[in-house]
């Protein structure tokens, strides 16, 4: 997390907390399906989150803008960007297999 804060000191405490919660969530999901490479978990923030946030240095999304992340895979760069830009609408799209599994898990969780 220090790495994220080093390059993005403007992040609010709420945003930092959300970024801090990402790794445990990915570890949990990675134990069920291969969301991201398991060998990358040790470098989660540098290889995935920081890499996704590098877009911020090149392009600034405006409040209310709608962004489509096609082929999002494990949710990168869409999820980190959605945390960074809370007033921008992000839609993440991936294969039917990935979406179906996620939908099934969400349905099972809701039913229990």
Question: What are these model-derived regions, one by one?
Answer:
Residues 1-24:
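N-terminal auxiliary segments of SAM/dcSAM-dependent transferases
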Residues 36-42:
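Class I SAM-dependent methyltransferase Rossmann-like catalytic core
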Residues 46-63:
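Conserved alpha-helix/loop element of class I SAM-dependent methyltransferases that forms part
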Residues 64-71:
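Conserved class I S-adenosyl-L-methionine
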Residues 74-86:
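Conserved SAM-binding loop of SAM-dependent methyltransferases across substrates and taxa
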Residues 89-94:
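Conserved SAM-binding motif I beta-strand of class I
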Residues 98:
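Conserved Rossmann-like nucleotide-cofactor binding loop
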Residues 102-111:
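Conserved small/polar residues in nucleotide/adenosyl-binding loops
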């Amino acid at each position: 997390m220090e790495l994220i804060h080093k390059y993005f000191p403007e992040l609010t405490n709420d945003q930092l907390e959300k970024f801090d919660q990402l790794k445990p969530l990915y570890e949990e999901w990675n134990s069920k399906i291969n969301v991201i490479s398991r060998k990358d978990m040790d470098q989660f923030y540098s290889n995935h989150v920081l890499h996704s946030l590098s877009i911020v240095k090149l392009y600034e999304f405006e409040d209310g803008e709608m962004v489509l992340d096609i082929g999002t895979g494990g949710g990168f760069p869409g999820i980190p960007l959605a945390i960074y830009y809370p007033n921008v609408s992000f839609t993440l799209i991936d294969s039917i297999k990935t979406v179906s599994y996620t939908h099934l898990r969400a349905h099972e969780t809701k039913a229990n």
